[in-house]
């Protein structure tokens, strides 16, 4: 049976236990299938508390070293992970919503598709559709948007295969090579990708804790003459800022004065408890509103709705989509319509919001005393680093510790972004694993910052 001991060089005791166990497994001192001592016995042997041992065994499971069997104990796996990095990293980089226990997507997704295929609409769901979307889907989309955007009508809506496809098509429709797009000083990386592909210039707009500054937007309009402003007004990605109602009105007024079009990317609005006026309400003649379902249900449902300024504009966007993706996936569009009409989508958004709040509460406790921004309804946070750390180096150190996060450079439009990282809370399979990862990150912040790679 394994003789518990610690690797003294580990930065945290529980990691010292795991590192010692892993070394013994690799060296053959502990054999596959061997049962480990009870947790209490390990704690007594090492002079640590039971919580430390529990964390150690959870980490050992994450690394693929052991498996726990209810009622029998913890056993060394037959094929422990052989990766040098110590197992599969905990991904805190992908901004995916947590999957709630109920409604269970693994159950309702296949059930919903099967139900559609056996319904009167089943045959149509396997046919080509209009590039604007089927009438039933556009009507359902209008009802879904009605609670957040006054005046949304089906004839102004285009059903698309996700927000990124919608953004690419909108830029292709509205802009030409060399045109200037204004965006926050840090912004959604998908916009940067589109700008690079379509040879657009990005002009950074200064931000504070509430989002872009109207006076900074005004200055960019005078100095760079952008054709379009892109923004995420609710729970911004990555900063988590939400534009207050008054500031939204100011931004709309600036856009109207300078004739600047607006792309309002609003994926997180269904998760927010408080309703704020959409830019599509404040400046409907200028605004293209994107409402994806990925953040309030699952990225597997590749559906986003675009609310155009008017019906004719919706048809023009559909023409661009016809030449690229042709149409949104009909089976998913039909499923989204069903979930809107039977209340499933509302239930999913509500369950995700509740889980987000639990995870944000855990993060706030673990990161207490640190400088970070978060929205209780969102599933990411924006962590400002201590002065000794650079964001890229911290992200690299985190990766070496088995944690994936995103440095500010991935979002930067301005040349000198803040030393900050985005941490996504949703993809961790459970709160326990998330808390373990956040605790590791918090511990990493206390270490001296050193260069992650040798320079020769």
Swiss-Prot record:
Q: Which UniProt keywords apply?
A: Aminotransferase, DNA-binding, Pyridoxal phosphate, Transcription, Transcription regulation, Transferase
GO-annotated biological processes = biosynthetic process
Q: Where are the transmembrane segments?
A: none
Every copy of the HTH gntR-type domain together lies at 11-79
InterPro entries attached to this UniProt entry? Aminotransferase_I/II_large, HTH_trans_reg/aminotransferase, PyrdxlP-dep_Trfase, PyrdxlP-dep_Trfase_major, PyrdxlP-dep_Trfase_small, Tscrpt_reg_HTH_GntR, WH-like_DNA-bd_sf, WH_DNA-bd_sf
Tell me the GO molecular function terms.
DNA binding; DNA-binding transcription factor activity; pyridoxal phosphate binding; transaminase activity
**Cofactors named for this entry:** pyridoxal 5'-phosphate
Keyword DNA-binding belongs to the record: yes
Q: Which Pfam families does the UniProt record give?
A: Aminotran_1_2 (PF00155), GntR (PF00392)
N6-(pyridoxal phosphate)lysine PTM positions read 295
Q: Which residues bind DNA?
A: 39-58
Lineage, top-rank taxon, reads: Bacteria
Which PANTHER family does the record cross-reference, listed alphabetically? HTH-TYPE TRANSCRIPTIONAL REGULATORY PROTEIN GABR
Family designation: In the C-terminal section; belongs to the class-I pyridoxal-phosphate-dependent aminotransferase family.
Full protein name: Uncharacterized HTH-type transcriptional regulator RHOS4_30730
